[in-house]
Amino acid sequence: MMKSDEGVSGNSNNNNNYKFKDNTFRKYGVEVVAYDNNNNNNNNNNNNDDNNTVTVNSRGFHISIHPFSFRNKLTINQNNGSIGGSSSSSSTSNSVSTPKPQSFYVDDAGIAKQLNQSVFDILSRSRYLSSLSHENLAEFIAAEPSQKHHDQMLIVSEDYKNSLEKQIEIQAKRQTPIPSNTIGRYAYQILKALSYLHSQDLTHRSLSLDNIKLDDNNQIKLTNYGLYYLSDHGENVSFPIGNLLYLSPESILRGAKGSSNTKADVWALGCILLHICLGYCIWQDNNPSIVTNRILHLSGYSTTQSFNSISKSFEQCELKKTIINEKQHEEYEEYDDDEDISEEEKEKRIKDIKLNNRDNMNNFINSLKREEKENSDSNSGSSNSNIGIGLNGLGKELIEIIEQCLIPNPMDRPDSETLLDHPYFNEYKNIDPYQLQWIIKPFTKSWDLPDSLESLTLKEIESYGHIGSDNNGGGGGGGGESDSDIYSGKEIYYFWKLLGGNIEKELVNKGFAKASPSVHKLPLYVPVKASLTESTNSGLNSPQPYQHQHHQHQHQHQHPNIIKSKNSTVYNNEFCLVELSNVFLKIKESFKLYGSKVFEEGIEQSNNNNNNRFNNIENNIELQIIIIREFHKLLYQYQYDDPTLSQPKIYRLAKLFVPPILRGDIWSSILGVNEREAKQLYNSINLDVKGPNDKQFELDIPRCHQYHPLLSSRQGHVQLFKILKAWSLLNLEKGCYWQGLDNVASPFLVHHFFNEPIAFASLKAFVDKYLSILYVPNNHAALSEIMLIYQQLLAYHDPELLNHLMDIQLDPNLYSIPWFITVFAHILPIDKLEILWDSILLCPSSLPNFIAASMIIQFRDSILKMNFEDGITMMSMIPSVDVHKCVSDALSMFNKTPLSTTVTKFVSNTDQELWWMQEVPFEKRKLELFPRIDIHDLINDQQKVILDIRTPLQFQQIHYPSSINVNPKLSKLQQQMEQYKGQQIVVIAPKDQGVDFTNQLIQWKFPFVSMLNGGMDSLEHGAHSLLIISNKN
């Protein structure tokens, strides 16, 4: 039996849990607390599972899969001519205007070519829903297109087994009504969730008892709040959205596809509260038309249903004209005579006028009160008298709230925020752990401390210090160091898929995916030929389904005949619950296996290459769970603490593995993006002004990664345009926009969809780090330098491939400029680009040169057999590159290559004696196929073969230890050099000499060949003590 004081005291014990959540990256989800019981006893046996206590508090958390079918929008051009039949030229001569194309929403199955725009738009809207976060909302996890039915979408969300509907059924069986204060708490939490949704410009529209779930702590979780928004207010589906019992009168009057405002949810809340109080819905009936008539009757309309205040029931009656008062009549006449208002808007306003009559609703509420009072006095009544507590069992304030919710006219009905400010809810706000009790001053003050610190006693200070220490550990017990975290629904779903979960298979296994007969896949609208129109229509017993017959006859030669079939798809609110016990068990095992100390030690060993324990992380779910836990800690510190302390740790952990579920947050932290500063900068840019590159953006965006569902959606185009425009306006002094910036911005937009400030700030930081020298009005010199470095690196690692490219005259300028000017974003799909950028963001800015070299080396066997034309064609195959191998090879090449090969070695205003540091004309440097290195790389690596091509006399006077004196003019030099092939070779040559010899080694296909910049002169200047000098004068 439910306690009567549950609604008041139910949340009071959760304050400490909420404090634990204050220090976690995620605020809502599955809570995990783990702590070492023997930590205070200095027990160093951290690998003993018996020393760790792990608790997974799921509160009944489940994942639900909700399939629904959508429709595509088909536009039919009404061209003059023979469409579906013959036409005469005279029939069009009297045409006043060319008919406009008409759009119809149709099922995919009847269309030969699959239409994807509806899918893309639905997926883009789903990303907005997945960004919502509230304690009383079930998390919207994802919307995924079905792999089996291209007109079906699968909604994945947080869910629970218990609901208000089931709770009422349980209370009815026990003959125990839900207490008044519990109903009040339900109303408060539902209103909190609705208020949050409405503040995000979202309408639930489908609020009902079965969509209001209860977790194991009896806290409200609203579900299925995204369908109305996903379906473009019902336009993309062939079924009406919403439970008829709780549908507002204005929604009924505007039709199934009419857009509902947020106050429709307030009406639904009033209906639900009344349902809970009575224990049943008083206007419920198996006939939908009767239900709508009863609701409209209570809203002031004259219908075939009326409420008998004596029998306290609805009954059939004759339809009478709706009575309106004199003021309403004047408004009615005003709208009816106004020619400036459209017919649709005029009809809507007239309907709203009729909703101003509250008499029926007031009589209805008062009758229910009187009935309950009479029943209580006589201790008798209807069979439903013991199911609900009744209106008289509620306080006056809660009854007032219900009455305000059920005001027929939405203009007079209060919104959710206004209702939430009702004095009745103050009691619940005071004990609400999520209610912000004060404004934090200063910004860095602890959430645990009160606003006034002057009057704190020593005991209070110690108590707050104790809470703070618990928070840092996550609320563990026993005083031991704890590892606590909260995993969001998206992360739980990610773990479930790593464990082999598949939503399509889950639906099949549980009987939710059933094969439909082919007739059920017929489209709602099909174009038919005129010769078939008569025979088709003659077989129909119903009137013409599309427009009036005379209208259709009038335009029969201007557009195709449209036959509307019966709605083949009816909304099914069934959903498939996914069992997650295996996921929770794996989380417990992971926390026991990898405590923080054990994990830190593992990282150190992995970085030192002493342990292979952390290899193959992609297939190791235990490690991924812990890595995400550690990232949660670091990302929280980065956002709310000192980012300079957490950023290096994020770097180190990201080198181990970047979880796809956190990639956007990790990238922005690596790039040094601060959320508050990003919003300030982005909001300071006036995007309303006309920009110099707006036209170019409009041309580029529709061609940018249009295979990607988010980037090809309408919302994706809008957001990408705004981000590019913001960057352009911020960089007006550069005076140019380089095509390809849209490709660079795309990955950041994908990971920060509906968060334009962070996407923009990430783009800005990325461009500043990797592309600042290229995105300038004159970037010829910078591009030429990059091309030369790339060519020299290719010669260093694969001279045979470079020689062949030079032989067929396939210059890097012909194929690789888009690689570098977009950091490969132009040529690679987003999924491969993400893997590439995971490494690029963690390494020096020279890594793209190595990636470019490794990318083309991957196709070397094919390229070596090609001529120029085939080679150009081959470059179009680069997107098929194995990106994992490319990154691995690039990092291997990077580690084998002297660092100074990619570093500029010239300094302006250099002393003439330091000739090797003076700038060399680029045309002269272009002749060098090899890279140059500095003396630091020569000294630090003793494994190099050093070839000194100075004269024997010069070599005898002074030379570098272990160097070999070689005569570059020997006739059998190539045979002599073969013994050094495959080793790192450094050439020491006199000033202005050695280029031909070093180039010759490259042409002989010697890899790892470089020249010491400055030769012996640089060694005498910087490493004189290391040289061997002859004693002879």
From Swiss-Prot:
Residues reported to bind ATP: 78-86, 113
Record keywords: ATP-binding, Nucleotide-binding
Compositional bias segments (type: Polar residues): 535-546
Biased composition (Low complexity): 36-52, 81-97
Domain spans labelled Rab-GAP TBC: 657-844
Domain Protein kinase residues, every copy: 72-425
Residue spans of biased composition, Basic residues class: 548-558
Stretch list, region Disordered: 1-21, 35-55, 81-101, 535-560
Gene Ontology molecular function: ATP binding; GTPase activator activity; protein kinase activity
Pfam family, one: Pkinase
Domains as described in the record: The protein kinase domain is predicted to be catalytically inactive.
PANTHER family: GTPASE ACTIVATING PROTEIN AND CENTROSOME-ASSOCIATED, ISOFORM B, RAB GTPASE-ACTIVATING PROTEIN 1-LIKE
Family in the record: Belongs to the protein kinase superfamily. Ser/Thr protein kinase family.
Protein name (Swiss-Prot/TrEMBL): TBC domain-containing protein kinase-like protein
